[in-house]
Amino acid sequence: MVEKHNYPKKSENLWTVNLEFTGGNGMLVLPIKKKWFYMILTGEKREEYRDVKPYYTTRLNKIFNMVDDIPLDYAETQVRFTNGYGYKVPAFIADCHLEKRTGRKEWGAEPDTEYYVLVIEKIRWKSMDNLGGYLAAQTERGV
């Protein structure tokens, strides 16, 4: 007899948009390399860079206030960063605002190159397997 598994529905796992954090809106998901992922989690790196190209302009324009390719304000929104692709990958959700400027070489930016800069204000949630995690308020209290 074949055993029937009761896997969570796609809408029930944390791989999909987490509505608790977004207030019902979609969330931008960005994969980043392991080095930068852990530098952000330790607080050593406070920015993530994306090339100013139509692909990122379209994606970022959906969640940030932009005209053409220029951010209009410093409004924060939550972004999910993952270390790799797939279901069980380390991830965190952070409050970010968007700027367009040059970046820091020690954080992976090329000199004299303009980027979309996601400035990370606060990490709200993190998980090393993307299946569960802790809210920032819980970890600050030592829970």
Model-derived regions: residue spans:
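Structured alpha/beta reader/binder surfaces that contact nucleic acids or chromatin modification marks
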Residues: 5-26, 30-143
